[in-house]
Amino acid sequence: MANLQRWDGKRWVNSGVGNFIKRWDGSKWVNALVRRWNGKSWETISQQTYTKDFPVTWTRSYGGEGQYKGDWLQSNNRLYQGRYGNPDIQWEGDWGIQKSMAGFNMANLMKELEGAKIEKVELYIHNMHWWYSAGGRLSVGAHNTTNPPAKFSESRYNMAWADWRQRGGDRWVTLPKFFAEDLRDGKAKGFTLHRATQDLFYYGYFYGAGHGSKSPKLRITYTK
């Protein structure tokens, strides 16, 4: 990292960038762990690759006009996406094309990712129900709101999607690396579920915050 440099022929550059420091583990070259004594303890000064999970800390669902559905209608923090059809409209009323937002502990996430190169981003999410027994399609966007807002907002629309072939079940959904880069840089604060269509293939709901192992979380692989 900043304490370990190499000469590239023109100038001194950080050695860890690009994983230039390697060691042979008996079968392949892997990133080397380099430490130095700072007078009190050993500290790592080479780049390493880490994979960490970041659970959601809040979730909210909204109606088609962007209005907050209310805690009692969310049924214990469900994340809704899409518009349901009849007879549910007659029974429940018409909420239009529903959408959801989820956020993280941004202070912790940004501290962990500060100065990091993002390698991979995955979202764990568990479906509770699709309109069709044959499954449906999840559409993931992004937002830039720190706390749960009264109105739905979105900064990126449909940046990733994933299909289910049955009603219920969980998935790890690969998201674009720029999403974690935006989180790292404070340009995004969480993800959205939103697809601007009345197609019932997109109607479903998912476990939100407070559901233990079934709650959404990000898994980010990064080098720093």
Set out the residue ranges of the language-model regions.
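Cysteine-clustered segments with highest specificity for TGF-beta superfamily mature ligands
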Residues: 77-84, 88, 105, 151-224
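Short, surface-exposed beta-strand/strand-loop-strand elements in extracellular ectodomains
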Residues: 133-147
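Enriched but not universal
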Residues: 1-48, 219-223
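Extracellular structured ligand-interaction cores
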Residues: 99-101, 118-120, 135-137, 170, ...
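Flexible, small-residue-rich N-terminal segments that precede or flank a structured functional core
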Residues: 22, 35, 42-108, 195, ...
